[in-house]
Each structure stands twice: as structure tokens, then as C-alpha cells.
């Protein structure tokens, strides 16, 4: 006995949602080849009944950080070294000619220098001025020369022409330590004891004694 043929359902008869598993299998090559009516397959495609599963692949994100462009670096066009009396810098020589040749604002430098050295009247303060290509400048104050500090401490006006025979003054060990402490940043040493010996040597060459003395005279040895 022949079985009755069942007609394939038309697209209009499908009203309920199709399960995900069934939708995934409808577009496989095997399922499409079994359809007796190719028009049904086109209906499935046109009505978007196939629901593709969400992608599980990971997308790689590349983050590019843009570093800020650095500003234009200033170029040093000159370094000027001067020794000026504290609080008394003026546009007169040597300041005016030295800075004017580099295009530096002379009055601005004098004002800044005098303000920073106002607490050291009577001292000669060395200064190192760095000039840039945009006419701006910076400067560093050095400590006064050791000879100036020794004359101030001893009360002498100038050093001796013959320091071995003629003495012009005397300082205490505490005064020597104070001068060495002030000069330490500019000396080629790291300890206060070494700085004191360096300053003591300068004092000896100027005819200034130290009480008590810290430098021991070397004895001459006679070799027969």
C-alpha cells in the first residue's frame, strides 16, 4: 500500500520562531539539498530565519599612545664669569660690555644679582651667567674667594709680600672652620677637615697665621 505524500509547508504556514539549533542546521549543505522545493530555501534566507550564533573570537585592540611633543630646547650661546661686589652691580663695566654683547637685559640682571647678594655687603661674589639663544639668562652665585674671606676674618687690608717673614694678621681655628664650611661646595674635597687644610694653605701664602696652627711644617732630612 502506497503511503500518501505529505506536501511541504509553505512559507506562510510558518508562524512560530524556529529554535536556534534548527536554524543553524537549515543552511547546512545537507539540509538545503534535501529540500524538495528550492523556493522554500530562498524564503528562509529572505526572511532571515537563520540566527547565527554570536562570535566567540576575540578582537585584538591596539592602543597607540601619542607622547606630547617636547618644547624647543634652548641653546646656550655663551657663559660669562664675573666677580662683582655684592648688592652693587650696575650697567657700567664690566657688566655692561660683557652682557650687552650677548643681547642680555642688563638692568634685569643687575636687579636680580643685587637682590640675591644684598645680605653680603662688602663681599665680592663671583657669578656665572649662562646666556641662551632667545636672549634669556640664568646665573649661579659662587662663594667669595678664600683670600677675601681670610682678609675679612683677620682684619688685614691685603696679603703679605713676604709671607714667611712678614705676617699681616691672625685667625682662630673656629674662624678657619667657618671659612672652610662656606667654601666647601666650591672646593675639590668632600670633608670639612680637607677644606680646612686647603684654606690654611691659602692663609699661609698670604701671611695670615692660624691659632692654633694646623699645618705641620715638614722637616728637612739630610741624606749622607
Swiss-Prot record:
SUPFAM superfamilies in alphabetical order: Ribosomal L11/L12e N-terminal domain, Ribosomal protein L11, C-terminal domain
Keyword Protease: no
Residues recorded with modification N6,N6,N6-trimethyllysine: 75, 111
One Gene Ontology term of the molecular function aspect: large ribosomal subunit rRNA binding
Intracellular or extracellular location(s): Plastid, Chloroplast
Signal peptide (residue range): none
Keywords: Chloroplast, Methylation, Plastid, Ribonucleoprotein, Ribosomal protein, RNA-binding, rRNA-binding, Transit peptide
Gene3D superfamilies: Ribosomal protein L11, C-terminal domain, Ribosomal protein L11/L12, N-terminal domain
GO cellular component entries: chloroplast; cytosolic large ribosomal subunit
One Pfam short name: Ribosomal_L11
GO annotation, biological process: translation
InterPro entries assigned to the protein according to its UniProt record, in alphabetical order: Ribosomal_uL11, Ribosomal_uL11_bac-typ, Ribosomal_uL11_C, Ribosomal_uL11_C_sf, Ribosomal_uL11_CS, Ribosomal_uL11_N, Ribosomal_uL11_N_sf
Primary location group: plastid
SMART domains registered for this protein in UniProt: RL11
PANTHER family membership: 60S RIBOSOMAL PROTEIN L12, LARGE RIBOSOMAL SUBUNIT PROTEIN UL11M
Binding partners and assembly: Component of the chloroplast large ribosomal subunit (LSU). Mature 70S chloroplast ribosomes of higher plants consist of a small (30S) and a large (50S) subunit. The 30S small subunit contains 1 molecule of ribosomal RNA (16S rRNA) and 24 different proteins. The 50S large subunit contains 3 rRNA molecules (23S, 5S and 4.5S rRNA) and 33 different proteins.
Record's function text: Component of the chloroplast ribosome (chloro-ribosome), a dedicated translation machinery responsible for the synthesis of chloroplast genome-encoded proteins, including proteins of the transcription and translation machinery and components of the photosynthetic apparatus.
NCBIfam families according to UniProt: L11_bact (TIGR01632)
HAMAP family assigned to the protein according to its UniProt record, in alphabetical order: Ribosomal_uL11 (MF_00736)
Record-stated family: Belongs to the universal ribosomal protein uL11 family.
Name used for this protein in its record: Large ribosomal subunit protein uL11c
Name of the gene: rpl11
Amino acid at each position: 500500500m502506497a503511503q500518501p505524500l505529505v506536501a511541504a509547508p509553505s512559507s506562510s504556514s510558518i508562524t512560530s520562531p524556529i529554535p536556534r539549533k534548527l536554524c543553524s542546521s537549515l543552511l547546512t549543505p545537507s539540509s538545503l539539498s534535501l529540500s524538495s522545493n528550492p523556493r522554500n530555501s530562498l524564503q528562509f534566507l529572505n526572511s532571515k530565519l537563520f540566527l547565527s550564533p554570536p562570535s566567540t573570537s576575540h578582537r585584538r585592540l591596539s592602543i597607540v599612545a601619542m607622547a606630547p611633543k617636547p618644547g624647543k630646547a634652548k641653546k646656550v650661546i655663551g657663559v660669562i664669569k664675573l666677580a662683582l661686589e655684592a648688592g652693587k652691580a650696575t650697567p657700567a663695566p664690566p657688566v655692561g660690555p660683557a652682557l650687552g654683547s650677548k643681547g642680555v637685559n642688563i638692568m634685569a640682571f643687575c636687579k636680580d644679582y643685587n637682590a640675591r647678594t644684598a645680605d653680603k655687603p662688602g663681599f665680592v661674589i663671583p657669578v656665572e651667567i649662562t646666556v641662551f639663544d632667545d636672549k634669556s639668562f640664568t646665573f649661579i652665585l659662587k662663594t667669595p674667594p678664600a683670600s677675601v674671606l681670610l682678609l675679612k676674618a683677620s682684619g688685614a687690608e691685603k696679603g703679605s709680600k713676604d709671607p714667611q717673614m712678614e705676617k699681616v694678621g691672625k685667625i682662630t681655628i673656629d674662624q678657619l672652620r667657618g671659612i672652610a664650611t662656606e667654601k666647601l661646595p666650591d672646593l675639590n674635597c668632600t670633608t670639612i677637615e680637607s677644606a680646612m687644610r686647603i684654606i690654611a694653605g691659602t692663609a699661609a701664602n698670604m701671611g695670615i697665621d692660624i691659632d692654633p696652627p694646623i699645618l705641620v711644617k715638614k722637616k728637612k732630612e739630610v741624606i749622607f
